[in-house]
Amino acid sequence: FRQVMQTTVFTLASAKALTQSRRLIDTQVQLKEFLPALRKSSWISLDTEADSLHSYPEKLCLLQISLPDTDVLIDPLSQIDMTALFKALASRELLIHGSDNDLRLMYAAQQFVPSKIFDTMWAARLLGFTAFGLNDLLSKLLGITLDKGSQKANWTRRPLTDKMANYALNDSRHLRALTDQLRDQLKSKGRTTWHEQICNKLIRDHAAPKETDTGQAWRLKGSSKLS
């Protein structure tokens, strides 16, 4: 595999001198101003954050979107109407890492189902990577090490700290470069079709979510042997 030997600790703040207020979209006006750039963008990568560690059921707390020239955070907790946003996303290929949770959150929030995704985690698994977390892949393939200090943060917190904002944006902004490398490797190994089939199944599964069987949800393998 092609690797970059020099590892760099990367934070968004050191790469782009943006204040949080400029990269956080939490009003209808800001969202409307952002949509033209989204619609004409040559690619779109995204990630989400939820409050699963602090409440149940979990809900979508943050949507991170990266385009060639910008990275933004969109705040669903601000009660903005995201209908136009998801309509714009629906017809595009979305670059996502480990899309299962993201797709579930976006469906629950807006009944959103994308038409096409490229899941970098599943690409790595098909290529035989034994460590396929985002940080693992970025380090191995791009020489980038991310600060994961906000991994267990409370994403309902407002305002977001700079550390939280940087953590969130870093999860989406490198996905295009990672996708390019993984897509090339899938093609060279003849596994592109397999990956497309997996991504399509992920989309189908979230387009028709199954009702939760509350009894089944609490059954554990071997639980009948407990006393």
Question: Which role does the model predict for each range below?
Answer:
Residues 50, 158-159, 220-225:
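Active-site flanking loop/helix segments enriched in acidic
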Residues 165-227:
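Mixed-charge, glycine-rich, non-catalytic linkers/tails in nucleic-acid processing enzymes
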Residues 4-44, 48:
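N-terminal accessory regions of nucleic-acid-interacting proteins
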Residues 7-17, 21-24, 62-64, 69-176, ...:
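Active-site-proximal helix-loop-helix substrate-binding element of RNase H-like nuclease domains
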Residues 51-66:
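An N-terminal structural lobe/cap that precedes and organizes the functional/catalytic core
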Residues 48-50, 120:
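Ser/Thr-centric signal marking residues that sit
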